[in-house]
């Protein structure tokens, strides 16, 4: 009998096996030992992973994200070698705003299965929320490479592109969202991505339909109500906007962003008293946030309370310590809301207090460094003209560009 010739070793395959073995050794020696034991030894029988996963899914459906996360973590401890549980845990953590933790658990899933498309997709979404857009794109493209039919990956890719603010190539985001829709038209992530792209293209009625469809799948997720409220606001339906955002607050009462958007919604309707109320509530949740001090300062300015506006806005521009001893770090000048609202409104507030000597240097910084920001440039120019004509004496006041 002729002896069969052995096939020559494939160096690429050998390298892959070596990497896989290294990953498993790392996971067994580093990741698994680091997981705390949930149950102490007792006569009580250990719950099955299936039972814990079912419980986690039930909590998720109810919008009880912290309980869902806890159950998934227990399921991981019951079987730390199941990548699917790490993926579901990471997905839930994203909805709960625990983005760095989500990245970690998506990577844990990849240690167990380096070719898992969904693990890459979830990691990409978490990185997007962290503002790490370059790595998010790398991860989501890897997810699509591994599984070109992964609808969630296309949905996340849509959001990553839009979050970068590059609207010159918005057609790419539209096309990718339509790809997600073609692959899985009924998925929550698909509806959310389509709603987001329709919102950013000004198609508000269609965006509302998509967010409503997502909410019909799970009406206990705060970010869906928040997003729907934002669309209603842009469509001029302030009452519906506030209603949806308050639902978001009920589901996530510790998130200051929702309260901040409610304050801006009321301000857009000229209801500055309510705007200040919600801005103060938002600030109470995170008193060290310069952004929240800035939002409150803008609301106070719009309500003609210039002295209190200055107290808040100077913390944004210069940093400092609040009356309660909370340290606030200043925000460097940058185009957009920081310049348009915080810096220029701070300068305009100073002019209304006959403090042009303090206001002019701020306006000069704006005019010198970010003259391309049309809103900030206009506000600074108006303030400079006011100071020149009034010699620091307030009269009719200065109205900033909205």
Annotate the PLM regions:
Residues 45-84, 88-98, 163-166, 189, ...:
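Alpha-helical segment of the N-proximal tetratricopeptide repeat
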Residues 1-47, 138-141, 145-156, 182-185:
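Long, contiguous interaction/recruitment modules in multidomain scaffold/adaptor proteins
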Residues 60, 87, 94, 121, ...:
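Position-specific recognition of the canonical hydrophobic site in helix A of tetratricopeptide repeat
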Residues 78, 112, 146, 183, ...:
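Structural marker of alpha-solenoid helical repeat scaffolds
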Residues 49, 83-84, 117-118, 151-152, ...:
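Helix-start (N-cap) detector for alpha-helical repeat units in TPR-like alpha-solenoids
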Residues 63-70, 96-108, 130-142, 164-179, ...:
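Structural signature of tandem alpha-helical TPR/SEL1-like repeats
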């Amino acid at each position: 009998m002729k002896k069969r010739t052995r096939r020559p070793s494939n160096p690429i395959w050998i390298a892959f096996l070596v990497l896989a073995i290294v990953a498993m050794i790392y996971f067994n020696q580093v990741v698994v030992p680091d997981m705390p034991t949930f149950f102490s030894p007792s006569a009580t029988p250990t719950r099955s992973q299936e039972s814990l996963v079912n419980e986690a899914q039930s909590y998720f459906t109810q919008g009880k994200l912290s309980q869902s996360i806890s159950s998934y973590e227990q399921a991981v401890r019951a079987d730390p070698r199941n990548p699917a549980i790490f993926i579901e845990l990471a997905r839930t953590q994203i909805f709960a705003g625990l983005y760095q933790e989500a990245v970690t658990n998506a990577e844990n899933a990849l240690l167990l299965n380096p070719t898992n498309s969904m693990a890459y997709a979830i990691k990409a979404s978490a990185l997007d929320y962290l503002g790490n857009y370059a790595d998010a794109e790398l991860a989501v493209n890897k997810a699509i490479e591994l599984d070109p039919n992964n609808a969630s990956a296309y949905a996340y890719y849509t959001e990553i592109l839009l979050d970068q603010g590059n609207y010159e190539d918005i057609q790419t985001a539209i096309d990718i969202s339509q790809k997600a829709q073609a692959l899985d038209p009924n998925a929550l992530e698909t509806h959310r991505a389509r709603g987001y792209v329709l919102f950013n293209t000004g198609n508000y009625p269609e965006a509302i339909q998509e967010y409503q469809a997502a909410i019909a799948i799970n009406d206990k997720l705060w970010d869906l109500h928040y997003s729907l409220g934002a669309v209603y606001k842009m469509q001029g339906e302030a009452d519906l906007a506030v209603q949806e955002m308050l639902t978001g607050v009920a589901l996530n009462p510790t998130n200051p962003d929702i309260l901040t958007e409610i304050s801006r919604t009321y301000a857009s309707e000229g209801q500055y008293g309510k705007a200040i109320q919600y801005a103060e509530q938002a600030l109470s949740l995170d008193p060290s946030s310069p952004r929240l001090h800035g939002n409150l300062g803008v609301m106070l300015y719009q309500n003609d309370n210039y002295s209190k506006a200055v107290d808040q806005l100077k913390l944004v521009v210069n940093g400092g310590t609040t009356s309660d001893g909370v340290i606030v770090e200043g925000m460097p000048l940058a185009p957009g809301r920081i310049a348009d609202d915080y810096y220029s409104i701070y300068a305009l507030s100073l002019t209304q207090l006959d403090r042009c000597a303090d206001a002019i240097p701020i306006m000069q910084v704006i005019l010198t460094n970010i003259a391309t920001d049309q809103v900030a440039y206009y506000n600074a120019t108006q303030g400079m003209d006011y100071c020149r004509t009034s010699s620091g004496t307030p009269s009719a006041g200065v109205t900033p560009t909205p």
